[in-house]
């Protein structure tokens, strides 16, 4: 007899909640939006924490390249090569590699360009951007200066120091 009582209690509580929602839709909407915002905020916090706790990837050394002139017909035993090149590092030993800055969020001094042309192109682009920023900073043309624009026959086609063609 306890099971039907629980079923009736669940039904009664559900009907009471439905009646409350019907009577106060603003309250329901507020709680719903509050729950969604809280869930998004919690998700954002967990995402930030997981990113900040993630280990930073270590840069790999230069890839080993095979000599293209070597013949591939000769049988090579890769297992023996791997066993011969394995070395154990002590506590004071370090791996050779590019020196990185001590700041974890600072800029890395690693050349990302593979050719001189790409480097030159990037430098020219940087110079253009610097010139545009300098032009923008030194001042904009005076748009409220003399000159008229419009359908009148005396219109000069200029507005301030700018000329529109």
Curated annotation (Swiss-Prot):
The keyword Transport does not apply. InterPro entries: EVA1_A/B, EVA1_dom. One of its GO terms (cellular component) is membrane. It is a single-pass membrane protein. Residues 74-84 have a biased composition (Acidic residues). The chain crosses the membrane at residues 29-49. Residues 57-109, 143-165 are annotated as: Disordered. It is found in: Membrane. Keywords: Membrane, Phosphoprotein, Transmembrane, Transmembrane helix. The modification Phosphothreonine is found at residues 85, 148, 158. Belongs to the EVA1 family. This is Protein eva-1 homolog B. The gene is EVA1B.
């Amino acid at each position: 007899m306890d099971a039907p009582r629980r079923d009736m209690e669940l039904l009664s509580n559900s009907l009471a909640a439905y009646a409350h929602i019907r009577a106060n839709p603003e309250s329901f909407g507020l709680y719903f939006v509050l729950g969604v915002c809280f869930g998004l905020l919690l998700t954002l916090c967990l995402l930030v924490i997981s990113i900040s706790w993630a280990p930073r990837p270590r840069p790999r050394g230069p890839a080993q390249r095979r000599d293209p002139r070597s013949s591939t017909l000769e049988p090579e035993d890769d297992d023996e090569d791997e066993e011969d090149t394995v070395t154990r590092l002590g506590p004071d030993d370090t791996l050779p590699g590019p020196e990185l800055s001590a700041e974890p969020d600072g800029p890395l001094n690693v050349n990302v360009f593979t050719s001189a042309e790409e480097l030159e192109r990037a430098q020219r682009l940087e110079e253009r951007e610097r010139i545009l920023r300098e032009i923008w900073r030194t001042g904009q043309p005076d748009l409220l200066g003399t000159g008229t624009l419009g359908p009148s026959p005396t219109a000069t086609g200029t507005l301030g120091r700018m000329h529109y063609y």
